[in-house]
Amino acid sequence: MIRRALGVAAILLCAAMLVTPQEKKDDAAWEKVAAALGKKGDLSADGVYKVTFPRSDLKVAMHGVPVPAGMGLASWAAFTRMPDGKYMVMGDTVMLGAEVNPVSDALRAGGIEIVALHNHMLGEQPQVMFMHYQGEGDAEALARTIRRALDQLGRK
């Protein structure tokens, strides 16, 4: 009886360790996303691949107190595979007012929809805007579009 239970447990453990073809496809997709974005992200247990981009180039102050990039001044993009095999991306981009049009133009040119443009703070200097977006399609193509949008940040 114990031997049989151990045998079943061993089989279940081996089965749990197998990587499905879809997981391999996702791993390859995340590698392409990282290459297109120029930065690796983190894969969560629920299959969301997220890459963050702190805006350490911005010198923002709130009531004279410096706001570090890690305190709400980071752009991010999160990807997941949909049941139909396409990928979805959602994200948030931190920007100055002068960066809004170039970033939105780059996102829309790549078929990514802008779903919100607003601020997260009041009284900060300089004023910082946040653009939320979403898109569906090929993971690498979405990542290339986001890279083109991020490349608009920090230009003078």
Please provide the spans of the model-predicted regions.
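Bacterial N-terminal signal peptides that target proteins for export
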Residues: 1-9
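Bacterial N-terminal signal peptides
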Residues: 8-16
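Long, contiguous binding/interaction regions
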Residues: 22-128, 132-156
